[in-house]
Amino acid sequence: MKIIQTFFIITLLWLSQGVQAERVKDLAAIAGVRSNQLVGYGLVVGLSGTGDQVTQISYTRQSLRNMLREFGIIMPPGVNLQPKNVAAVSIHAQLPPFAKPGQSIDITVSSLGNAKSLRGGSLLLTPLKGADGRVYAMAQGNLIVGGFGAEGNDGSRVTVNIPSTGRIPNGATVERGVPNPFNNGGPIILNLHAADFTTANRVAAAINSAIGAGTARPLDGASIQVNAPAVPAQRVSFVSLLENLEVDPGEAPAKIVINSRTGTVVIGQHVRVQPAAVSHGRLTVTITANPAISQPPPLSGGQTAVVPRTDIDIQEEGSRMFLFAPGVSLGEIVRAVNQVGAAPGDLVAILEALKQVGALSAELVVL
């Protein structure tokens, strides 16, 4: 018997009554001070028979030929390389701000072909390029792979985690730094992680109170302009003082986030509901499979067979109605839904319906 049910987890996010002060560095970032993405293409060698099947992945064979040619090894025409210990991979990394030549960064290596596992492999020297096509780092090293896989002669296979992706800590050496506008002089722009006019105004006020009037001014709901010293050493000390100032951020807007795939419902504290009456019913579908044996008549020459027989039963619960008074809070919403025996899936449907009729004073985000 198979009962179709929906299991959900409801997570309720309660915000504290008094907003805690946060540091400026936790609320905003300096414009221009950011990491940059690097990417590259290379070969992982030394695999224990778990590499690409080059008969199906032609670019792995071509890459291997090109690499051998770089070392002066020319394969005769008509020779088809069929190694099992080589895999074509992509490499990506984050180049942090202010990275200098000679520093090391972590890299992630992912299989591009049909390699079964990268465990035990070594990445050959690979250039990592930025969006402008220039080489900013060189990567090489032995992979650390968290997953593994095993396969039997009969085709059965067991895989734990993802063996086709690995990491190399400090696997790339920075060869070129990215120009940064931080030391160019002029004002510093603080960009809030979450745009909010109240927070922007409070950050500017906190800076002016600590450093001096006219030092900072909000440009919009996401940016604050701060006058800073032109000398690099003084700018570093100034930003160090700036980012440790504490600010009371503005309260988050009323919002409900629903993940329909996992059943997670997150409801902010300031969610309110206008007067509304809700009636919601549910269906329970029960499917029962009872195979039956079909016997042929005597001397008919037929064969005994198994005949599938499925019974489907649908039960509808009686609809229950409840009334939301003006300004109902988060706790009262959940309490009312629980009292009528509604599941989290029903709560999702109720919230969407309340939003449609204009009774829900909150932003509804469905993931």
Swiss-Prot record:
One of its GO terms (biological process) is bacterial-type flagellum-dependent cell motility. GO terms for molecular function: structural molecule activity. Its main location: periplasm. Keywords: Bacterial flagellum, Periplasm, Signal. The keyword Signal applies. Residues 1-21 form the signal peptide. This is Flagellar P-ring protein. It comes from Nitrosococcus oceani (strain ATCC 19707 / BCRC 17464 / JCM 30415 / NCIMB 11848 / C-107). The gene is flgI.
